[in-house]
Every structure is written in structure tokens, then in C-alpha cells.
């Protein structure tokens, strides 16, 4: 079926501390999410087809991403984004908590623009349609800007009774038509900076909006879902083909009901045949509910005027035609999914987290729909091997994962105690008197002073190291050696009892032999010890014998110096040759060079000798990469039958090897 | 012709130092942990001297008897009015003795769990009770009323009332049928002999409140633990200074134990560590970490079960599996088999007549595919086979073998990027290992010789090579520093 399908962009915004900010691009081939790392947030881009991580970008520490969206291709003519921003690939627009807009190029793998307009607070929705960028902040202030230059085209505030906004959704069909969402939906004409319509749709915050334009009816349909709501409300807006948007033409055309609260929506329809749309709703428990032809209400289907209001209502609401869920085994609760998006009208891409991995799967739902039982498809995905590996790890002794055979769980016990003590506390709580407060203040001061004097002690590991050496505790020792901060190592060794230095050196030698890759850090330790405790080590009798181990290991390592250095030189030579050749240097040279040999009739004998010496270096090259020089060789063949022979002789060791190799492999 | 004959023998390298000692291995073999949670802190663990070495665990107001093999509760004795202390099983495994916080000392019949004796002579909590291992009817009790009492079981009367401690008595132990040692919060260890009129024979000052004393089997040494230190006292010399002071714990030591051979001392402390000392030199030979502050510990007499009780009520049992020696066929069974016509499966081989000399065929191990390839001069194939799924040592062995037979160049040449990359990746991975680096340097040089700048033809190979260069650069820096350090060492030990 050669029907082009145009799925809508699926995205999801507004989650605390950046977790759960995800977006699929228009083709559902790329998936971006923002994850919380130790210090800074990371932007990860996945290839949903291959299911692999494409790139990871570490954002600056203080930047907290609040929304994310891929570039959308508008259906109307528009100015393109310059390649230095997009890298001729797709771009991703990110909004931060502090009102900044970041443009990330997927091809270049870096942030190419950072715009700060100064008037925006926490951004909750940002979009890019070709060169037009749009952003809305939490107070409803909308800014339209040029992506290429960062110049603000218009900015205004959406007048609304609600204090908080949740997103901005743009039409790819009509320029300047947008939906701003809070508890309500505001249809906005960006050109005239005025809201056309305001609809009261939900009682809670709207989390997802999808829309579709039906040309035949000249109507603009959209579906709205909100947090903690099972209903998806559907509306239609009539347009009068003048390019202006008339007001008050919005009609509620029905509602879709899910079994659980809706998390996000996704829609897909075929461009040629827009009547056949399909809407997918992802619910909080991880089930996907599919609604085919969502805009086609039963009311219109029946064509009759329903007798009573309740009957009308019943006809207006419709249930899903198909439910899909993933579970570990049949009957288990479904796996909670992170996001969904349509690849085409027939297949749906699904993402979920498998411990730290992100798993993608494409569901050909129309094909699978024949297997549905009671309108539900359960897809069993057992845990991956990765997690089973973790299980074997847990065999290592640890009280926390050991099986408890009797008694009560201490955790539960503690809870009850805590409740008891909390209740007791409430009774006793009283405001401290002024004198008590003063005392507390002086105490705090003293503590602060004490802390400042102890800082030097806290940066050293000498106590731990002493204990580890005394008790021969390998794991404790390992925890010390893992430290690679030179300053810490230095202070630690300075504080160490000199009598322990020989033991420390012995242990270091052992580690060095076992873990040659960690030589960098371990040698810092050895160096510090030798320098700091050198004075004491000289006094130790029989030191040579005691440190024989260390000496031999170091000497062994040191003996590799010259060969390694030589190897480095060789590698340098080869790599720089490669670089040189890539730059086109060798070709230029080849052209500039004088011909290697010139054929003069009558001078044959004398020439042969001269050319043979000149060719020696060259011939080895020839035999290695025949492709590069084959042309030259061919050309020379006819002219120098003698030289050709000589070449063969010179490269005997190579060609000889080859022939041997060939005969053997046969 | 220098064709390699037979199987490739793996290259041997100088043995690496092994940080795991035999001692570590032994103590690590205590695994298969089972954890039980009790309501309150576990104050005492005592093993029965009788096989199967069940043990009594005292926590809160009850004493539980755990089965050694099932490692779960067999019996529960909860007939205490207050917190119970020091559940102690008699050496024949029939009676249990325990003190409690009211000062009552009770003796239970373990089979029926009935109270045989309830003795109320102490006014204050009794923290320690112990049956005399040398006489069935004698036991001791030590109390917070600063006294140690020696009782006769048959009459239930106090035989000796030993007073002398100036603070709570928290630990006491039998040294022989008539001699005792006790320690208390006054920081003294006192030795008592019940045969003489003035029973206090000797006393040592530990310096800190003593939580546990342990007499050694020889009778000449007593070990005491108080605060974060252990002190070893020599009774024969009778000196007031300890012969050895061990301070390997960060916090108070709460329990001591000996293994049945009297060669290792175990100590557990509030820092959650159990440390094991070799008593010949008092060096720590092994350490174990537990999740909570340790209050009590017991090692079964057959050294199979290590039980540790913690202040948060966790009871951890670790068990060592003893592999049974597979007994060779007893002659009796063999006889029976032959009697019933069971014929041994061993094939009869003709070994010749008496005057003939039988030459046994030497058994050869089968050649592996790469051995065969090597034998038939397919050097390149042999190397590929090893590279595909061989241990690093095997790969190195193959490379060295190829060097020796002069086939390295053949094996390395005529490769495309797909077959060259795994080799370069192997080089990159192991070139920093001093055991391998010499060989690998030669291999790398050979590759560079053969291919030279043609390596740039493939992006994959070029990437691999540039990564290899990074490694080599790091190694150059390391070896340079190693040279410096060797210089330092020479200066110090000259």
C-alpha cells in the first residue's frame, strides 16, 4: 500500500525534575528523552528502529529542562533553517526552567543556539516549524521567534482565568493557528495575538492534545486529554476558507472513554484518505487503547436525532476498539510504558524502561488485532537477560537481599515505632524560648568553627588506610586505592605511620602486578610513599629484600619503555601518513613528482640499473596497495617488461607469502 | 622442518601474587547465609557441645533453640518475666540455663521445656550463666549485684558466693572444675579458685569496662575484651601487663570465640566487623563485615556454622559445606557384586605372554582445530580460530608459536578490514599488560610493516589503530614513570 501516512507529533512535557520528558520525532524513528544524571541532566537520543542509543549530550549543570520537542515540517511554504543550526538534520528544541530556549542539532550532536528572551519564566511548551519558533511559559506568555536569528516576532500573554498553563500545540496545516492549554483550551491566532475561542474542557491540567484537519468538511478536529481523567474530549472547529479564523464555531463532537487515566495521546491518518484516522491513548497503568475513526461520532452515523439527552450522551461517548498491553507473563499487570507514537497508521512504536535500558518495540497492531481476546491484546515480554544477570550478582552475601526465614521485618517494625514517636513528639512540641535560641546559635557557631578546622582531616584516608593495612583487609584497601585525587593521596600518605610504609609498598606492588591497567593511579601512590617516607625507608634494614617484589615489577614495566616508545613512533608515522593521504597530499605529490623512469631507446641497459635502485622503496608500496597504484603499474607494464620482472623479484617476500598462503588455504 | 607437533601448550607466565590466602578461602567458604529477624537485640549465642550442634539464641524475653542442619527455630522457651540473658546449653544437650533481668536464674529441660529450677538469689539482672563443662551438676551465674555465684544443680543451693568486683559482672567463664575467671564493668579480670578459703587468686586491670573474657584451653592464658581492644594475659607469668594488645576494631568489642582446634580467635564488635586472628602471631588473617553492630557470635564445634547476632535483631547464619569424601568401593560390596554375577565393565586388553614385552600405546590428546590448522601451515586460519574464541593466554601462545615457526608475517598478511580489526582490538586490550606487551609490540610492528599507510583505507581499521595509539601513549607515560620510580628505589636501597 503506497499510501503516505502522516502521524502527528507525540510529546509529553511537564514532569518534576526532568524525569519523563520525552519526545518522538514526526517519523517516530528518533526518540529523545531527558534523564537525571548525578550532577547534570543528560539528553539522550535513541534510534527507535535499531533500539540503540545514538547520542548522549550532557547539559550544563544549572540548566533544568522542562520541555522538549522535535522540529515539525509545516505543510505551508516557509523559510528553512540554516545548516549551521540544523546541520542539515533534524533539530530538537528544549525549554528550561529559567526561560531559555535551547536548539539542539541531532546531526551535529551539540547545542547550536541558546536563546533567552528575558520575559519568559519556566517554559512549558516550545515548538519549531521550519524557521518559526514558538514558546509558552507557565504564566501563558507566548513568544514567536525566528530560529535562525533569535529575533522576537511577536509576544503576548494569553488572557485566561487559570494561573498555570501546560502546553502549546501548533497546527502544521495553518500558519499562525495554535492551541494553548491550561485547564482550558485557548485557540489562538498568533498573527492577531488574540484568542479566538476559549473552551472549558477539563477540571484538571491538560496533558496532551492531538488534531487533524479534514479538508472536505473544512473542519479542524482536536482531541484533548488531561491528568487524572479517563475521558478524551473531542471538538471540531469550522473554518471559512478566507484565511481568517472565525470565532465561536467550536462544537463538542463527543468523547472517548478509557479504562484508566490517560497519560498521552497519539494520532495517525493517511494524507490521501483523511477520514481513516486512528487515535491511540496511553493510560497510566501501561495499556494502550486504540480508537479508530475517532471523529466519526455515532450520532452522525445513525443520522437520527436521539430522543433523550441521556441517550444522546451515550451515543456521543465511545469506547476503544482495541486495547494493547505488554506484560511479563499472561495475566500479570502490564508494564508501564514511557511513550508511544505512530510510525504509520498500521504500526505503533512503544518505549519502556527495562531497569536502565530503554526498550523499543514496533507493534503492527492492525495485523495483531485478529488475535485479540475481548478486545485486548496481551503481548508477553519476559524480562531480558540483563536483569537475570543481576540476579546472579545478588548471590553475593548481603543482609539486605538474604531470605528471611522467621521473625518480623525490621522495616515494618521501625515504621510502627516511628509513628508512635511522632505522635509523642507532637504533644511535646513547644516553641523554644529566647534564651534557648541564643544558646543554639552559639552552639551552631562553635560547630561551624570546629568543622572548618577539621577539613584537612576529612580529606585524608589515613585512618582507613591504616586499618586496612593492619588488618589486611583487601576490600578496604581497594577503596583507598580507588581514590585518584593527588591531593588526597598526598595528605593520606603524609598522615600515615612511617612503619606501615613498607607494607603499603608491598600491597601496591601486588595491585600493580594484578591490575596493570591501573598503573597510572598506583604509581602516584608509590611515588608519594617513596618521597614522603623515604627518610624512614632508608633506616629499615633489609629494605632491598622487603621491596624486591616492587622493584622487580617496576623494573619489568620500565624495561618496556624503549619498545613502547618505538612502537609509538611507528604508529605515529602510519597515522600521520594516513592523515596526509586523506588530505590529498600524496596525490598532489604524485603529480608533481618527476616520472620515475623515462624510456629512451638505445639507453636500455644503463637505465635499468638506475631505475632498479630508485624503485626499491616504491615497489614495496605497490605490492601492498595495488589499488592505489594499479593504474600507474598498468601503464608501465607495456613500456617496461624488464622492470616489471625486477619488481616481482624485489617484492618476492610478499608475493611469495601470498602464493604459499593461497596454496595452504586450498 | 619445524612443524609444530601435537597440541599447542599454553604459554606459562610468572605467577601473579595472589591476594587471597588459604585462610581467606576457608573463611569465605562460610556462605549460604540465612538471616532471621528477632524482635530485639540478640545478646547471646551458645552452641551445644553435642552433635548436631544445635544452638541457643537469646533475644528479648525468650531463648530459641535453632537446629544446626535446618537452621531454623526448633524450640522456643519464653517463660521469662523480663529480658532473658545468656541461654546456655549443658554439654550433654539436655538442659538449658538462663538468667533474666529480674535476677532469676532458671533451668529448663530441653525435651519438655519445663522449668526444673527457678533460683532467686540475685537481686539484680543476671547477665551471665554457664554450666561447668567439667562437672554436670555445677554452674555459675554473674550478676549486676557485683557477685559471681557457683551453684549445685541437684540441691539448687549456692555453693560459693564470690564477691570482689566493684561493678557489674558481665562475663564469667569456667577454666577447670574448680577455677573461674570473671570480668566486669570495673575493668578488672578476676580469677577465682573455689578450693581455697579466700577464693580470689589473681586480678588484672584491663582499663576499660570488660564485655567478655575467654580462657584458652591450655589454662595458662586468658583473653579479655573491653572497649575497642583485646588483651591477652599470661597467667603463668602473672604479670600485670598484657602480653599482647590487639586494637583492630573501631568500636567496642562485644564477643569473642575460639575455633575448636584452638588455633584461631574470632572477635566481633559494634563496628559490625568480625575479625579472625591467628593466635600464633596474633595477626588478623581474615575479616568479615556485617550489616549491624554485632552483640554475640558463635562458631559451631565442627567449624561449620558461624552465627552472628546483631543489635538490630538480625541473626545471620553462615554455613560451610563440607564435601563428603567419595568413598571408594568397599571391598565388601565388590564381593557381593561378583557373587551375583555382576561383571566389571573394564575391557580386557591382551598384554602378551610372560616372556613377551608389551609396549603400551601412548595416549594422545585430540588435536584442536587450530592445532590442525597450524600443522597444515594454515597460519592465518589458526590465528583466526584462536582470536574468535580463545583466552588471551591462548592467543598470546599462538602468536608466540607463529613467531617461532616464522609464520607470523604469513598469518597477518592478506587480511581485509573485517579480519584485521579483531586482531587490532585484541592488541589494544592487552598491550598494556606487561606479560604480553613484548610479543604484542612485535605483532603490532609487523602489522604496520605489512600494511603501512594502507591501513587508512578502512575507517574501521583506522579507528582501531588510533585507539591503539592512545593506549600505547598511555603505556609510554606509565613506563617512563616506572623508570623514574626504579631510580628512586635504587637511591633508597643503595
Curated annotation (Swiss-Prot), chain A:
InterPro entries: SSU_processome_Utp12, U3_snoRNA-assoc_WDR, WD40/YVTN_repeat-like_dom_sf, WD40_repeat_dom_sf. Keywords: Nucleus, Repeat, Ribonucleoprotein, Ribosome biogenesis, rRNA processing, Transcription, WD repeat. It is found in: Nucleus, Nucleolus. GO terms for cellular component: cytosol; nucleolus; nucleus; small-subunit processome; t-UTP complex. GO terms for biological process: maturation of SSU-rRNA from tricistronic rRNA transcript (SSU-rRNA, 5.8S rRNA, LSU-rRNA). WD repeats lie at residues 14-56, 60-114, 201-246, 259-301, 316-362, 495-535, 570-609. Transmembrane segments: none annotated. Residues 618-633, 641-666 have a biased composition (Acidic residues). GO terms for molecular function: snoRNA binding. Residues 603-666 are annotated as: Disordered. Pfam families: Utp12. Its main location: nucleus. Involved in nucleolar processing of pre-18S ribosomal RNA. Required for optimal pre-ribosomal RNA transcription by RNA polymerase I together with a subset of U3 proteins required for transcription (t-UTPs). Belongs to the UTP5 family. Component of the ribosomal small subunit (SSU) processome. PANTHER family: WD REPEAT-CONTAINING PROTEIN 43. This is U3 small nucleolar RNA-associated protein 5. The lineage of its organism: Eukaryota, Fungi, Dikarya, Ascomycota, Taphrinomycotina. The gene is utp5.
UniProtKB/Swiss-Prot annotation, chain B:
It comes from the Eukaryota. One of its GO terms (cellular component) is small-subunit processome. SUPFAM superfamilies: WD40 repeat-like. One of its GO terms (biological process) is positive regulation of transcription by RNA polymerase I. Pfam families: UTP15_C (PF09384), WD40 (PF00400). WD repeats lie at residues 37-76, 79-118, 121-161, 164-202, 205-243, 248-287, 289-328. InterPro entries: G-protein_beta_WD-40_rep, U3_snoRNA-assocProt_15_C, WD40/YVTN_repeat-like_dom_sf, WD40_repeat_CS, WD40_repeat_dom_sf, WD40_rpt. Its main location: nucleus. One of its GO terms (molecular function) is snoRNA binding. Keywords: Nucleus, Repeat, Ribonucleoprotein, Ribosome biogenesis, rRNA processing, Transcription, WD repeat. Signal peptide: none annotated. It is found in: Nucleus, Nucleolus. Transmembrane segments: none annotated. The keyword Cell membrane does not apply. Component of the ribosomal small subunit (SSU) processome. Involved in nucleolar processing of pre-18S ribosomal RNA. Required for optimal pre-ribosomal RNA transcription by RNA polymerase I together with a subset of U3 proteins required for transcription (t-UTPs). This is U3 small nucleolar RNA-associated protein 15. It comes from Schizosaccharomyces pombe (strain 972 / ATCC 24843) (Fission yeast). The gene is utp15.
Amino acid at each position: 500500500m503506497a499510501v503516505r501516512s502522516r502521524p502527528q507529533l507525540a510529546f509529553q512535557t511537564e514532569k518534576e525534575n526532568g524525569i519523563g520528558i520525552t519526545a518522538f520525532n514526526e517519523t517516530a524513528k528518533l526518540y529523545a528523552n531527558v534523564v537525571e544524571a548525578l550532577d547534570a541532566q543528560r539528553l539522550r537520543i535513541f534510534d527507535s528502529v535499531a533500539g540503540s542509543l545514538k547520542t548522549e549530550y550532557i547539559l550544563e549543570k544549572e540548566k533544568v529542562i522542562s520541555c522538549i520537542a522535535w522540529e515539525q515540517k509545516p505543510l505551508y511554504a516557509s523559510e528553512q533553517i540554516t545548516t549551521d543550526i540544523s546541520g542539515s538534520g533534524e533539530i530538537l528544541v528544549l525549554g528550561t526552567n529559567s526561560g531559555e530556549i535551547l536548539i539542539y542539532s541531532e546531526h551535529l550532536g551539540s547545542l547550536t543556539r541558546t536563546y533567552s528572551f528575558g520575559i519568559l519564566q519556566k517554559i512549558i511548551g516550545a515548538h519549531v516549524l521550519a524557521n518559526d519558533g514558538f514558546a509558552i511559559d507557565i504564566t501563558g506568555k507566548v513568544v514567536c521567534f525566528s530560529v535562525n536569528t533569535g529575533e522576537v516576532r511577536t509576544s503576548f500573554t494569553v488572557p485566561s482565568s487559570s494561573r498555570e498553563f501546560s502546553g502549546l500545540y501548533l497546527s502544521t496545516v495553518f500558519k499562525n493557528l495554535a492551541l494553548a492549554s491550561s485547564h482550558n483550551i485557548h485557540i489562538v491566532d498568533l498573527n492577531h495575538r488574540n484568542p479566538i475561542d476559549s473552551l472549558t474542557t477539563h477540571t484538571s491540567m491538560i496533558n496532551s492534545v492531538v488534531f487533524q484537519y479534514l479538508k472536505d468538511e473544512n473542519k479542524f478536529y482536536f482531541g484533548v486529554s488531561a491528568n487524572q481523567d479517563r475521558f478524551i474530549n473531542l471538538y471540531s472547529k469550522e473554518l471559512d476558507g478566507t484565511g481568517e479564523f472565525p470565532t465561536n464555531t467550536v462544537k463538542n463532537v463527543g468523547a472517548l472513554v478509557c479504562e484508566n487515566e490517560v497519560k498521552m495521546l497519539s494520532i495517525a491518518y493517511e494524507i490521501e484518505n483523511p477520514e481513516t484516522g486512528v487515535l491511540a491513548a496511553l493510560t497510566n497503568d501501561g495499556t494502550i487503547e486504540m480508537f479508530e475513526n475517532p471523529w466519526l461520532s455515532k450520532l452522525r452515523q445513525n443520522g437520527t436525532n436521539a430522543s433523550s439527552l441521556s441517550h444522546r450522551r451515550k451515543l456521543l461517548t465511545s469506547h476503544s476498539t482495541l486495547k494493547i498491553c505488554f506484560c511479563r507473563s499472561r495475566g500479570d499487570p502490564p508494564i508501564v510504558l514511557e511513550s508511544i507514537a505512530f510510525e504509520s497508521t498500521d504500526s505503533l512504536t512503544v518505549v519502556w524502561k527495562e531497569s536502565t535500558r530503554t526498550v523499543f518495540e514496533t507493534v503492527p497492531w492492525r495485523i495483531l488485532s485478529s488475535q485479540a481476546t475481548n478486545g485486548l491484546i496481551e503481548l508477553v515480554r519476559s524480562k531480558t537477560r540483563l536483569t537475570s544477570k543481576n540476579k546472579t550478582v545478588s548471590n553475593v552475601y548481603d543482609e539486605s537481599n538474604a531470605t528471611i526465614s522467621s521473625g518480623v521485618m525490621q522495616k515494618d517494625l521501625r515504621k510502627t515505632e516511628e509513628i508512635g514517636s511522632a505522635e509523642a513528639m507532637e504533644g511535646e512540641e513547644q516553641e523554644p524560648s529566647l534564651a534557648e535560641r541564643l544558646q543554639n546559635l552559639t552552639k551552631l557557631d562553635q560547630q561551624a568553627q570546629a568543622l572548618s578546622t577539621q577539613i584537612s582531616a576529612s580529606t585524608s584516608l589515613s585512618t582507613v588506610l591504616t586499618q586496612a593495612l593492619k588488618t589486611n583487609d583487601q576490600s578496604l584497601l581497594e577503596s583507598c586505592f580507588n581514590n585518584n585525587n593527588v591531593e588526597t593521596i598526598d595528605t593520606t600518605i603524609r598522615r600515615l605511620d612511617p612503619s606501615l610504609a613498607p607494607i603499603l609498598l608491598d600491597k601496591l606492588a601486588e595491585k600493580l602486578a594484578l591490575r596493570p591497567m591501573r598503573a597510572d593511579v598506583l604509581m602516584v601512590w608509590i611515588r608519594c610513599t617513596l618521597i614522603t617516607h623515604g627518610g624512614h625507608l632508608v633506616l629499615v634494614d633489609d629494605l632491598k629484600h622487603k621491596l624486591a617484589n616492587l622493584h622487580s615489577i617496576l623494573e619489568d614495566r620500565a624495561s618496556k619503555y624503549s619498545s613502547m616508545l618505538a612502537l609509538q613512533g611507528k604508529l605515529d608515522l602510519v597515522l600521520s601518513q594516513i592523515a596526509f593521504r586523506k588530505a590529498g597530499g600524496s596525490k598532489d605529490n604524485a603529480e608533481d613528482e618527476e616520472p620515475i623512469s623515462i624510456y629512451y631507446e638505445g639507453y636500455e641497459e644503463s637505465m635499468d640499473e638506475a631505475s632498479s635502485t630508485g624503485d626499491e622503496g616504491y615497489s614495496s608500496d605497490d605490492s601492498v596497495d595495488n589499488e592505489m597504484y594499479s593504474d600507474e603499474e598498468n601503464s608501465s607494464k607495456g613500456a617496461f617488461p624488464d622492470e616489471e620482472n625486477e619488481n616481482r623479484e624485489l617484492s618476492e617476500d610478499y608475493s611469495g607469502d601470498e602464493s604459499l598462503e593461497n596454496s595452504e588455504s586450498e | 622442518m619445524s612443524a609444530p607437533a601435537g597440541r599447542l601448550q599454553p604459554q606459562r607466565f610468572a605467577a601473579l601474587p595472589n591476594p587471597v590466602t588459604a585462610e581467606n578461602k576457608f573463611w569465605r567458604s562460610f556462605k549460604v547465609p540465612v538471616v532471621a529477624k528477632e524482635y530485639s537485640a540478640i545478646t547471646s549465642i551458645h552452641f551445644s557441645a553435642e552433635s548436631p550442634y544445635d544452638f541457643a539464641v537469646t533475644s528479648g524475653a525468650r531463648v530459641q533453640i535453632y537446629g544446626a542442619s535446618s537452621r531454623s527455630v526448633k524450640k522456643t522457651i519464653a517463660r521469662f518475666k523480663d529480658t532473658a540473658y545468656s541461654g546456655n546449653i549443658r554439654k550433654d544437650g539436655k538442659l538449658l540455663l538462663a538468667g533474666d533481668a529480674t535476677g532469676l536464674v532458671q533451668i529448663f529441660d530441653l525435651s519438655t521445656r519445663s522449668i526444673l529450677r527457678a533460683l532467686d538469689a540475685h537481686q539484680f539482672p543476671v547477665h551471665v550463666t554457664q554450666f561447668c563443662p567439667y562437672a554436670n551438676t555445677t554452674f555459675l551465674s554473674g550478676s549486676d549485684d557485683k557477685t559471681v555465684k557457683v551453684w549445685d544443680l541437684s540441691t539448687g543451693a549456692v555453693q560459693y558466693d564470690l564477691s570482689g568486683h566493684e561493678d557489674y559482672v558481665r562475663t564469667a567463664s569456667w577454666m577447670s572444675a574448680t577455677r573461674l575467671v570473671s570480668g566486669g564493668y570495673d575493668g578488672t579480670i578476676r580469677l577465682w579458685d573455689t578450693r581455697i578459703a579466700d577464693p580470689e587468686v589473681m586480678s588484672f586491670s584491663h582499663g576499660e569496662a570488660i564485655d567478655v573474657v575467654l580462657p584458652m584451653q591450655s589454662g595458662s592464658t586468658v583473653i579479655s575484651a573491653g572497649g575497642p581492644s583485646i588483651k591477652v594475659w599470661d597467667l603463668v607469668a602473672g604479670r600485670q601487663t598484657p602480653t599482647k594488645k590487639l586494637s583492630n576494631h573501631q568500636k567496642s568489642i562485644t564477643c569473642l570465640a575460639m575455633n575448636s582446634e584452638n588455633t584461631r580467635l574470632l572477635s566481633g564488635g559494634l563496628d559490625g566487623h568480625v575479625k579472625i586472628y591467628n593466635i600464633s602471631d596474633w595477626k588478623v588473617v581474615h575479616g568479615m563485615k556485617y550489616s549491624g553492630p554485632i552483640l554475640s557470635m558463635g562458631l559451631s564445634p565442627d567449624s561449620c556454622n558461624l552465627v552472628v547476632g546483631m543489635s538490630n535483631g538480625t541473626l545471620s547464619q553462615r554455613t560451610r559445606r563440607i564435601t563428603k569424601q567419595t568413598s571408594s568401593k568397599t571391598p565388601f560390596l565388590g564381593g557381593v557384586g561378583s557373587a551375583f554375577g555382576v561383571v566389571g565393565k573394564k575391557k580386557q586388553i591382551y598384554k602378551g605372554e610372560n616372556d613377551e614385552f608389551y609396549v603400551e600405546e601412548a595416549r594422545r590428546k585430540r588435536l584442536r582445530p587450530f592445532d590442525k590448522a597450524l600443522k597444515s601451515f594454515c597460519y592465518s586460519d589458526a590465528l583466526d580460530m584462536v582470536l574468535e574464541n580463545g583466552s588471551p593466554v591462548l592467543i598470546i601462545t599462538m602468536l608466540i608459536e607463529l613467531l617461532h615457526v616464522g609464520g607470523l608475517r604469513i598469518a597477518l598478511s592478506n587480511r581485509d578490514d573485517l579480519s584485521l580489526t579483531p586482531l587490532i582490538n585484541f592488541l589494544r586490550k592487552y598491550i598494556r599488560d606487561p606479560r604480553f606487551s613484548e610479543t604484542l609490540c612485535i605483532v603490532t610492528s609487523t602489522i604496520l610493516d605489512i600494511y603501512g599507510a594502507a591501513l587508512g583505507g578502512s575507517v574501521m581499521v583506522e579507528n582501531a589503530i588510533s585507539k591503539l595509539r592512545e593506549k600505547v601513549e598511555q603505556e609510554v607515560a606509565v613506563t617512563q614513570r616506572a623508570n623514574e620510580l626504579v631510580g628512586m628505589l635504587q637511591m633508597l636501597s643503595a
